[in-house]
């Protein structure tokens, strides 16, 4: 029996998966006994990152996050392509990059190795629109199945690629972005009449300029050397064939607005202090 995909609602989406590095070693060394003192380090580590795991810039305004163990995924639907949803997609991407940077800064400040992540593009199909199941007799939730992560191929691909690690050239506490993310942004920008993203290479740095409905949105920098992910004897690609780029830096219009807001706030405090001193 064959199924016609047109009878199902399949949505395009972006998804990121971030995973703490070195988190499994204490569990392995303790034989997976949480009472073992070696696990205390992991408890303290995840507790310090708790707020960064459970709150996110990427989930505003419309993204959704799924957190478990030492990793989390954030996803957003990118259909239908309109100026509004395109801008929300850019906000999600900008927030996801800042989320990754925040986790790495905080984790490495405490001499931990940080996180590794992948952002990719895919589709999702929700087979159950109820996010959880509640048993009235026992008065408890008996299952969780968030619609946004049901059959989410972007989530699956990000998880698989990140898990491949250094065997696939995805090494260290870095973030890697699938070229399919760029392809979607370029396609969507063209469809709604925005300026197409521009790419140039300066020395060993690939510079990507992204534009939104109101003009320039962000400048992203990557290592110019591509990472070809596909069939390879060193790892199982699970049918994924794409190209990744290692993220280095971002400057966005949101950064400028935040800096301006901080500057204005500092001026207010300064003026208040001057008025207080003059009284």
Where does each model-flagged region fall?
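Catalytic NTP-binding/metal-coordinating core of nucleotidyl cyclase/transferase enzymes
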Residues: 2-99
